[in-house]
Amino acid sequence: MGRYTDSVCRQCRREGEKLFLKGDRCYSEKCSVSRRAYPPGAHGQGRRQKPSEYGIQLREKQKTRRIYGIQEKQFRNYFRKADRKQGITGDNLLVLLERRLDNVVYRLGFASSRKEARQLVNHGHFFINGHKANIPSMLVRVGDIIEVRQSSRESNKFQEMKEQAAYKTPPEWLSVDAEKMTGTVLAYPRREQIDTLVNEQLIVELYSR
């Protein structure tokens, strides 16, 4: 299955809540969820049936996939990896998703959305520990130093991000030096440090069927 290419605003409306897929627009009056708080399509404003238990679990999985921009096969692989680890499977899953390079770039404030972060990583704008890193799904490790490529730092895009990053506070497991355009992974995130509004237990129940 290819990557979803339709309007990201439609994805938020389908879930009935903001997934913050479009950066600053999600915080503005232009947000589609604020203006049209009903699902997309001809029957979007019609009466909605009460979802089944399976339907609720499926929606939660789809929502999480959309938030992190991950395809089904890759998401299932993350779940299997999380299930093999010690600890709580749902927590392990979210930690793996948070460790993705595109997510870390977003969390550091070097991109306005995960989608933009993925594009910037793909285009080779970032280094990890001095080596070029252009794979969005790469999992960062404790101690990794992420930096904007030297030749990219003077671009208008990154100068703007530099100014914005100076006013943003990264999660506790990351540190950022906005002036030098670098960030460091201090630790792996704990569940309480992840502000993504998902119920991961529903995903565990879905895949455990």
From Swiss-Prot:
Residues 99-162 form the S4 RNA-binding domain. GO terms for cellular component: small ribosomal subunit. It comes from the Bacteria. PROSITE patterns: RIBOSOMAL_S4, S4. GO terms for molecular function: rRNA binding; structural constituent of ribosome. The keyword Ribosomal protein applies. CDD domains: S4. One of the primary rRNA binding proteins, it binds directly to 16S rRNA where it nucleates assembly of the body of the 30S subunit. With S5 and S12 plays an important role in translational accuracy. This is Small ribosomal subunit protein uS4. The gene is rpsD.
